[in-house]
């Protein structure tokens, strides 16, 4: 039983490695893979293309199994055997397994789409020496935007932390002031003269502590007032918004994101056109190869026909030479008998 499974798998592996399988399957993938991307959402066109792929593979496999004499049950058993799910064989049998597994089919088509795009980019770069602008600068714009956003977020978090620390410092100073105020009132009721001097010290200390706080608060006065009533997350968002407004890049970021979308669309359209041209050239070269093969076959046939005609003419010449030889011999014999 195991030997039968190995024999069936060996036959299928040999078939999927040959041109009868690879040529139509690769041609189908190259023509249909342009609509596939790596997004999680599956489009309706994916299902239609998958059904077309099923029909193609089933037709090719059925022809091979009938020629070799393998039944459908034997083929199913071989595909479900543990040997078929090994890492090496699974990679080779991926186009066959993609008939029943849509995830494998989609991953295979996405990979082929990426390969064609990279191939088109290499051809463009080899032909022109450099890449067009629509393929060259789009990623730099995105990275610059990401760096600006990260700087703004870091700045907002830093300012939020400083504001939180200042708020804690103000609360501690306020509590200390209230405690000392109560203590001074108790001292005043007992008629102590040291209390005013003692109370002036923390008040003065509080003023001295407030001075650097006010200097730090001045660039972000409005946001600092609001942050007193906000949580840490809300404070970070407020600082981010304020930092964007003060840097004057809020509108530019929005514009750049739109420009980036247009740039990506141009890039995708450009690659699509180049890929279509590449596929058209492949089809044209394939037709030229087929035509040349047909011409060679016709030339070979004509040579064979000429050879047959030459053989016939040689046979006629031989017969004629034999007749002439016989006539010469007869004439010689007659002349000898006459003498």
Swiss-Prot record:
Keyword line: Cell projection, Cilium, Coiled coil, Cytoplasm, Flagellum, Nucleus
InterPro entries the UniProt entry points to: BART_dom, BART_sf, CFAP36
Biased composition (Basic and acidic residues): 281-313
Domain of life: Eukaryota
Positions of region (Disordered): 177-212, 281-318
Coiled-coil annotated spans: 142-188, 255-330
Entry GO CC: cytoplasm; motile cilium; nucleus
Primary location: nucleus
Stated family: Belongs to the CFAP36 family.
Name by which UniProt lists this protein: Cilia- and flagella-associated protein 36
Source organism: Xenopus tropicalis
Underlying gene: cfap36
